[in-house]
Amino acid sequence: MSLEILDQLEEKIKQAVETIQLLQLEIEELKEKNELSRQTNEQLRSENEHLKTEHHNWQERLRSLLGRIDNI
């Protein structure tokens, strides 16, 4: 192989390594974003469940009050 071909091969290898490193960084960033999204999702689900329970409790109280009014 000529020196020129080896230089071209070396340059392509360097570019490939740089591309791989950039992709690895991007993967790490995406993993972090994914984890943050997962945590946010879990918090929202928990809050939603709490609000549903609270809503149900208010409905029960309202039904009870309406029942008392009907008995008057």
UniProtKB/Swiss-Prot annotation:
BP GO terms, sorted: division septum assembly; FtsZ-dependent cytokinesis
GO cellular component, one term: cytoplasm
Subunit note: Homodimer. The ends of the coiled-coil dimer bind to each other, forming polymers. Interacts with FtsZ.
Coiled-coil positions: 1-71
Function, in words: Non-essential, abundant cell division factor that is required for proper Z-ring formation. It is recruited early to the divisome by direct interaction with FtsZ, stimulating Z-ring assembly and thereby promoting cell division earlier in the cell cycle. Its recruitment to the Z-ring requires functional FtsA or ZipA.
Pfam families: ZapB
Region (Disordered): 36-56
Main location: cytoplasm
Residues that span the membrane, as ranges: none
Protein name per Swiss-Prot or TrEMBL: Cell division protein ZapB
Origin: domain of life: Bacteria
Organism annotation: Histophilus somni (strain 2336) (Haemophilus somnus)
Subcellular location: Cytoplasm
Sorted UniProt keywords: Cell cycle, Cell division, Coiled coil, Cytoplasm, Septation
Biased composition (Basic and acidic residues): 44-56
Family: Belongs to the ZapB family.
